[in-house]
Regions:
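C-terminal accessory helical subdomains adjacent to catalytic cores in phosphodiester-
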Residues: 2-27, 38-60, 74-88, 93-177
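Helix N-cap/beta->alpha junction signal
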Residues: 32-34
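Phosphate/oxyanion-binding active-site loops and adjacent basic polyanion-contact surfaces
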Residues: 37, 62-70
Length: 177
């Protein structure tokens, strides 16, 4: 009886495997400022896009500066993102205005590079899903406003899961911007 051959994976097959009969989900690399942004991105992918996107997150800490986000997404794209359809930086304006030039340079490097900036914070974007509100609110007031309007019967907590009803109201927020 002959010995069975052991299967060795070549370097080319490492990484994302293609299931037979199916195409790969498009890979999108994200660098997010905080836990709330990461949770929101995952909720969007699940509830709005039906898990048709494969997200990959750059290793960032909560409250990352824009400089750190640009640096981390560049590293992630070099390591894992050569086949990525897009790369997104998601952050707030409240503490990032001074690093804007770096972001603009990164955006010019590739058509695959994108940015989503919320002003003053991502919670303002959440409020727009459920009501029209003043643009002049600061981050602290926005969080109080959101707490009153939070869907799902609970109060809002940074980094907590995002209710599907909020994601389903995305078109409302887009119209109110």
């Amino acid at each position: 009886m002959a010995k069975s051959k052991t299967c060795v994976r070549s370097r080319q097959s490492r990484g994302r495997r293609v299931p037979r009969g199916r195409s790969l989900k498009p890979l999108v690399v994200f660098a997010a400022e905080g836990a709330t942004e990461r949770v929101y991105i995952n909720a969007l992918i699940t509830h709005r896009y039906g898990n048709r996107i494969a997200p990959s997150f750059a290793e960032t800490r909560d409250h990352s500066s824009l400089t750190n986000l640009v640096s981390q997404i560049k590293s992630k794209m070099q390591r894992d993102g050569s086949g990525a359809e897009g790369a997104w930086i998601v952050c707030d304006t409240d503490a990032n205005a001074c690093h804007r030039e770096q972001l603009e340079e990164w955006l010019l490097e590739s058509e695959r590079h994108h940015v989503a900036i919320s002003h003053p914070c991502i919670e303002y974007w959440f409020v727009l899903h459920v009501k029209v509100t003043a643009r002049s609110l600061d981050a602290q007031h926005v969080v109080k406003e959101l707490d009153k309007e939070w869907l799902g019967g609970k109060s809002y907590k940074k980094g907590a899961s995002i209710p599907p009803d909020l994601i389903n109201a995305t078109e409302n927020a887009i119209k109110r911007v």
